[in-house]
Amino acid sequence: MNLKISNSQIEHIKGANSYLIVSTFLIFIVGLYFSLLDSPPDYIQGDSMRIMYVHVPSAWLSLFSYTILAISCIVWFVTRNPIFNLFAKSIAPIGAAFTLIALVTGSIWGKPTWGVWWVWDARLTSMLLLFFLYLAYILLWQSIINQETAAKISAVLGIIGFINIPIIKFSVDWWNTLHQPATISKLSAPSIDINMLI
C-alpha cells in the first residue's frame, strides 16, 4: 500500500505540529509545577512521595505503549498493511523511554523508602523485562536488513512479549511484593483520593 501525502497536507501538518509542540511543552511545565512544587508533602513519606507523580504515569504509559505495539503487530499480521508496522516501530522508543523513566524514578523513590536502589521484586523485575522487550524490538528492526523479515520477527516478538503486561499489572496481587496492591479497581471505588487521581 502506497501512502501519498500532498505538499499542502505536509505544510498543514507542520503548522499544526508547531502548535502541538508548544502546547504540549506548556502543559508539561504546568503539570510538573503542580505535581512537584505545589503539591503538599505526604504525611508519612514527606517530599519523596512527589516523585510518584512522574513514576506512576510513566509506568502506565509504558504498559499502554506496549499494548498499542502488540495490537499493531496483530493487525499487521492480519492485514499486512505497512502502516501498522510504522505504528509499532514508532511507539517502541516512546514506550522504552517511559519504561526507563519508571525504572529510574522508582529506584530514586525506593532508596529512601526501602533503603536500597533495587530489589528483585516481581513488579520491578517484570518492568525490567518490559524494557528489554522494547530494546529487543527496536534492535530487531535495526539489525535485520530485509524489511519483510524484520517485520515478521519483530511482530512475533511484539505479540509474545504482550504476555508480560498482565504479569506486571497483577504481580502485586499474585505474589508477595514490596509494591502496594492496586489502588484502582473495577470492583470497588479507588482507594486513592479522587483529587490525587485527577
Task: For the regions a language model picked out, list residue spans one by one.
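Non-cytosolic membrane-interface motifs at loop->transmembrane helix junctions
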Residues: 46-53, 113-127, 150-154
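Membrane-interface helix-loop-helix modules in multi-pass inner-membrane proteins
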Residues: 94-139
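Alpha-helical transmembrane segments of multi-pass membrane proteins
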Residues: 25-43
